[in-house]
Amino acid sequence: MEDKANGMYKARNIRGFCHLSNGQEAANVGLIDSISSRDVICDSYRMHGIAFLRGKYVRSILGELCGRSSGSSRGKGGSMNFYSKDNLYGGYGIVGSQVPIATGVAFAMKYREDNHISYPDANDERRIAIGMYGDGAANQGQIYESFNMAKFWNLPMLFLCENNLYGMGTSVERASADARFYMRCHYIPGLRVNGQDLVSVLCGTRFAADYVRSGQGPFLLEYYTYRFLGHSMSDPGLR
């Protein structure tokens, strides 16, 4: 699907922003297979694979990229702003903005449960929220604010950093004093897994999701992965 989008962009059937995730397939598949369909995902702008795995048809994804009404967001969102009623609350184009939104979703989940507005029965797992962000967004202040709020209220929140080693064209070593993103919050437990290995992603994500779902509070998970293409289709020579 990403290769098709690549070709359609070069043929000028797709305009504007387009961020492909070639190389990060194991991370996407492992995540979706490790969580419940009732869990809420707030993703960044590199999210075509997540949209597909959350139930969107290839036709609706490519339609969205082409700005057609058959697209998943009626053609108005484009590459960076997918949405699905199946607990996929975007794609967000503003770097890091999805993390406080996911934290707010986690707060709502806990508030409703604590006040018996929506309480899981014996056969129903507790829901969690997943806030996905990249290494380029990891230095955003709003993410640290979200860390604090999530731990202060012990929210059912999984912070998920997809570290593909480059924020646009800048390597993490040239932008971060400490590139161990899973250790960024000393009061939230963290784990790094090999994002290129499906089994590693499955084991690590299931462990993290079970921790959050058990009511112990937030967890910080890092996928150490790599994208095979440039930051976006606007990167010359990297397509």
Regions found by a protein language model. Give the residues of each.
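Glycine/aspartate-rich loop-and-adjacent alpha/beta segment that forms the canonical ThDP
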Residues: 211-239
